[in-house]
Amino acid sequence: MAEATDVVLVGGGIMSATLGVLLKELEPSWEITLIERLEDVALESSNAWNNAGTGHSALCELNYAPLGADGVINPARALNIAEQFHVSRQFWATLVAEGKLEDNSFINAVPHMSLVMNEDHCRYLQKRYDVFKTQKLFENMEFSTDRNKISDWAPLIMRGRDENQPVAANYSAEGTDVDFGRLTRQMVKYLQGKGVKTEFNRHVEDIKRESDGAWVLKTADTRNPDWQLTLRTRFLFLGAGGGALTLLQKSGIPEGKGYGGLPVSGLFFRNSNPETAEQHNAKVYGQASVGAPPMSVPHLDTRNVDGKRHLMFGPYAGFRSNFLKQGSFMDLPLSIHMDNLYPMLRAGWANMPLTKYLLGELRKTKEERFASLLEYYPEANPDDWELITAGQRVQIIKKDSEKGGVLQFGTEIVAHADGSLAALLGASPGASTAVPLMIRLMHQCFPERAPSWEGRLKELVPGYGIKLNENPERADEIIAYTAKVLDI
């Protein structure tokens, strides 16, 4: 006998938690069930040590505004990401102010910096600063080539550095470090208090659609396959991180045809020595290597996890065929079907530099990896650093009318035409833009309900529908309000 519920959220990460809270705020009478394959929420990509914890607001990430072939830097993408992060930030602040989250401990003020180390990159960074400085959301950004000034911002990155090496840096005091695991747990605790059912250790075996339009999920307990649970719902969200592609394929919706995935693993060096960690308070992003994917941009970060400060450096990209950190090595081969084989082959052929890069990363020894860290922290002591494995990221491969198949970085919502099912594919900037992503998903899947949501959405996100970059006075009010509530 199937258990009926209005909404099923598959996956216990930041995306399902965000969508769950939004729906509970906008449709409090709807019954919601969240199911997770592991024993608790936020154990995969949302876990603090499975991501970099950067509040992605385009303050330091150079790949969001590259130098164009015409020599021009276009800030449009960076501004879009910054606007989205401020939507998330407003939503979190409202939940804290209304007492729906325990506290604001999930977010900390950590300055964001960009650091470059050759003359060409220094010229680029100066040009980027000149462009960004004219934008409201980046107006407080600082730039310097003065070694003493950069050392004031982040002493460890300059100590022991070659005096003849050209260096330049951007600095933004408004940066943040976010523990998305803690945020997810607080959100889910709130949902549980509102009657949302949470089912853990539940693996989705099958997804089928009935003649009346309802979706039926057959699940088995991972500890005992005989403990079956069947759910029947009118709306299904597949937000299982890297596992969303497999679930989308199980659903059989036509909109999901032609999608494939490239799993990319990440390694980081972590330093938990308090004497070292207390000397660095910044997220310092550099330039990606030629041929490297955007998510492999090296950065030396302050991390605040469970009340303790750490340093983290990476990522070092690698390849495992798992779609989830605790997934199966068969995830990739089993995801290859007739409808996505050609797009995957075409995308693979078109991205040979990426393939070579990943192979090169796989061959690196620990010492070779540590040499990259020394570029950002010249006096780093190998004894203070441990190599940890972060979460899996599954980059999107999709059909393309001209190229046959393309590899796409970023996130994408794939939804059934009638809005009864939606999946979120892809990765960065991911969690930082969870709130605008889920609002967009809700409007796409429930267009008839959207008008009735406007009032409450404007309470949850005070700047909802407003481009802060184009409304300076409103931007000042909202940014000051969220900074006060979140203590950032």
Swiss-Prot record:
EC code: 1.1.5.4
Names of the cofactor(s): FAD
Keyword entries, A-Z: FAD, Flavoprotein, Oxidoreductase, Tricarboxylic acid cycle
Enzyme class: oxidoreductase
GO BP annotations, alphabetical order: tricarboxylic acid cycle
Signal peptide (UniProt feature, chain positions): none
InterPro entries in the record: FAD/NAD-bd_sf (IPR036188), MQO (IPR006231)
Pathway: Carbohydrate metabolism; tricarboxylic acid cycle; oxaloacetate from (S)-malate (quinone route): step 1/1
Gene Ontology terms, MF aspect: 2-hydroxyglutarate dehydrogenase activity; L-malate dehydrogenase (quinone) activity
Reaction catalysed by this enzyme: (S)-malate + a quinone = a quinol + oxaloacetate
Claim: Flavoprotein is one of the keywords in the record: yes
HAMAP family per record: MQO
PANTHER family: L-2-HYDROXYGLUTARATE DEHYDROGENASE, MITOCHONDRIAL (PTHR43104:SF2)
Family label: Belongs to the MQO family.
UniProt-recorded name of the protein: Probable malate:quinone oxidoreductase
Provenance organism: Neisseria gonorrhoeae (strain ATCC 700825 / FA 1090)
